[in-house]
Amino acid sequence: MKHKKKLIALTAVCALLAYWLYPDQHPVYPASDHYDPKTQTFFNPEPQQKPTGLTGAFWKILTDPQATRPPKPLPTVKPDWQTFLAAPEGKSRFVWFGHSTLLMRIGGQTVITDPVFGNSVSPIPITMKRFQPAPAEIDELPPVDVILISHSHYDHLEKDSVQALNSKGNSHFIVSLGMGVLLKKWGVPQERITELDWWQSTERNGIRYTALPARHDSSRTLTDHNQALWSSFAIEHGGEKFYFHGDSAQGSHFDKIAEKFNGFDITFIENGQYSKHWPNNHLFPEQTARYAAQLAPKRFMPIHWGAYAMALHAWNEPLLQSLPLARSLGVNPLTPLMGQVFDADTATQDWFAEPLQ
């Protein structure tokens, strides 16, 4: 029995090493201002500063959870699916599940962004655990028409969530260029995958999706760094326009996006997981507020917070710092509870600033 257990353990270790050390084969794409066919990797037109002090930063995150995690469960509500699905034409509705996972009801279609429902967003699953369960599980969701994924990092692309959604029906995946290789490996048929390069668009059932630049990176293993692209997205239907930020540091691409779209109904912009140790990977709170103002939305909703601690700041620090500045710049924030059905006109409270009950 002991030998059998050792053999099983050895097999598991070998499988994990094979996954990490042997990369998937990606197509070679045409050369561009953000892709090098010689190295078969994407890059940022504006170079990133290399992260520093990662070991110490992540060790503090792991060993001092009181500094980064809420002391009590965050308030949530169970989604009212009847209200969500009854979104009238021109009045899209949304549900936030924490971090960057949003369910959108637009033009009679249901769209989910960066679906991550798992307990951990780390390749080492005992780390970076979710603060609490999502307000609903995947099995409780209404049928999903489109799955929109910005990039391949674990907190935006989760194998279990992808496979669970894929098994529920005929959802179509719209993803950044290069991500199809992994999705097909996980069982998603080629005909249900659309990959987009920056500034490319696709239309499904009257909804237009456009991949937009971001300043970030991608990887899941030791050997696949930047083999898939990272993007933000514009989503347009009728007279409505929404912006889903994904992950991105500050850059000149924001100017181009603002000029191209001339305002949005709601911008969903990352507001969390920043650090001086990785200054060119995420927006700092002041940058989030200024970028939100630059995009001229009716409402700005901070995302990329509320579910996982992946940086050294307190769980609510991003909002406490960004929202006062956003308001001073004329931006109207939107801060629903996780699970709450909301739209561009929903009145919300700064619940994150109050003591947790």
Label every model-predicted segment.
Residues 2-122, 126, 134-137, 177-244, 321-341, 345-346, ...:
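Metallo-beta-lactamase
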Residues 22-29, 35-37, 146, 153, ...:
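Cap/insert and terminal regions of metallo-dependent hydrolase folds
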Residues 101-105, 203-263, 279, 283-287:
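Catalytic core of the metallo-beta-lactamase
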Residues 113-114, 173-174, 190-199, 265-270:
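Short hydrophobic/aromatic-enriched beta-strand-loop microsegments
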